[in-house]
């Protein structure tokens, strides 16, 4: 029996993941602002202004939707380790930027059409590379 290769609607998958992240954030940290969707909208508007099109535009939109894909993963791990942590005030920027490193590992499992390496990893990095992600990674 011949088995057809699995066809994945990557845009639909990214949208579903984004909605799932919204639900988890609302449940875990009571955040209901749809941050990923706003970042994606602004990113796509800027990309269109810069004449980015096709696969590159689609991949940019997906990265923007999923840029914080590991934030809730990281926060839930911290809460399990330190149950008395005040989630909104008790996590330092340096510690929360670990989600960039976790997110980079998660995102490599998605078959993008263009090179998206480092988009998730460095989304909190400063222009002078003096941010906490580079310091944490090194």
Predicted regions, residues:
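Histidine- and acidic-residue-rich, metal-dependent catalytic cores
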Residues: 2-138
């Amino acid at each position: 029996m011949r088995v057809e290769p699995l066809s994945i609607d990557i845009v639909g998958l990214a949208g579903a993941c984004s909605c799932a992240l919204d639900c988890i954030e609302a449940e875990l940290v009571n955040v209901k602002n749809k941050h990923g969707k706003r970042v994606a909208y602004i990113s796509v508007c800027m990309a269109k202004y810069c004449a980015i099109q096709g696969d590159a535009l689609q991949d940019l939109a997906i990265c923007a939707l999923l840029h914080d894909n590991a934030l809730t993963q990281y926060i839930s791990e911290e809460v399990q380790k330190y149950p008395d942590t005040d989630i909104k005030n008790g996590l330092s920027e340096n510690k929360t930027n670990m989600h960039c490193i976790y997110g980079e590992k998660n995102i490599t499992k998605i078959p993008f059409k263009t090179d998206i390496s480092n988009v998730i990893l460095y989304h909190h990095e400063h222009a002078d590379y003096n941010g906490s992600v580079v310091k944490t990674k090194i």
